[in-house]
Amino acid sequence: MQRVPAIVIPALAAILASPAAATAQHQQQIQIDEWQVPWEQSRPRDPFVGPDGKVWFVGQRSHYAAYLDPETGDFEKFDLDDGTGPHNLVVDGEGTVWYTGNRTRHIGRLDPETGKIEKFLMPDDRARDPHTMVFDQEGNIWFTVQGGNFIGKFIRGTAEVRLVEAPRVEGSRRGNGSRPYGIKMDSHDRPWIALFNTNKIATVNPETMELRSYELPEGSRPRRLVIDSHDMVWYVDYARGYLGRLDPATGDVREWANPSGEGARPYGMAIDSDDRIWFVETGVQPNRFVGFDPATERYFSNTAIASGGGAVRHMFFHEPTNTIWFGSDTNTIGRAKLPPRRRGIS
């Protein structure tokens, strides 16, 4: 373990240097604070706020898990085996950290009290790169395997791993797998998965482990997704620069063009307790943190990320503080303070 203090990058006003930025000055801007991670060029990513308020994240390039204490600004690091390539983590109610060993085909369990790590290997060698995780209502972990082309369920009580192979794709320049990517749970405890190498979103029946997919507009490439309080599936279309909404009951899809247009490259995504959608446009520099209100069907917030962002890949909404946490390719951990919650949400 290694504990070090942080350098804080203060929030800056949006940089008005592009058409998107010029439009943004007419929209609400929010406060974004960033902490410089002390381990250089480590690609800190996928933060998750634990029960004690510490913000856990992984260093994908430098093979560690770490936390930021936002009260003190201190960081503490837990080294993983060289070559692990951790991609994502989640923290359970007891404070135990679970991470994906993206380059070593395992899910890891880290005990922060002792530093002890326990590894759970994938039962199929093809499931080589566990990617993104999410808890279900029973505390089990659903996860994606991007290159290996699986969706998985890790049952914590027995350490059993169940895998469902995603559909194959013909004629793609990015290989013949669907590339399961972002994953979230709905209110019925069903996982929803963005199939990034397709124009489809999938779900898995938790009882039968059968997969069903829903088609999006031609050319769409969904990368991340969130589920609102009505079980509507919202996604960012990385290829075309759209925010989309899938109604699972009908299969209907609606789309809204991103503020920065076709080259927006929307990536990291979150939803707050008012069902407002937040995502980051990574195709523009500095990256832009964008808010969309489904009640008005309008973009209402657009803020530049002071460090530039590079790429913000994943985001976490912390309801008790009404904040969104993210990691950036500029080696920072960021916190966005959201506008006050609305009243009378239907």
Regions found by a protein language model. Give the residues of each.
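Short loop/turn segments that connect beta-strands within beta-propeller blades
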Residues: 69-73, 111-115, 155-159, 205-209, ...
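Blade-level signature of beta-propeller repeat domains, shared across WD40, Kelch, NHL, RCC1
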Residues: 310-346
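Bacterial N-terminal signal peptides
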Residues: 7-17
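Conserved beta-strand positions in repeat-built beta-propeller and related beta-rich domains
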Residues: 55-61, 97-105, 141-147, 191-197, ...
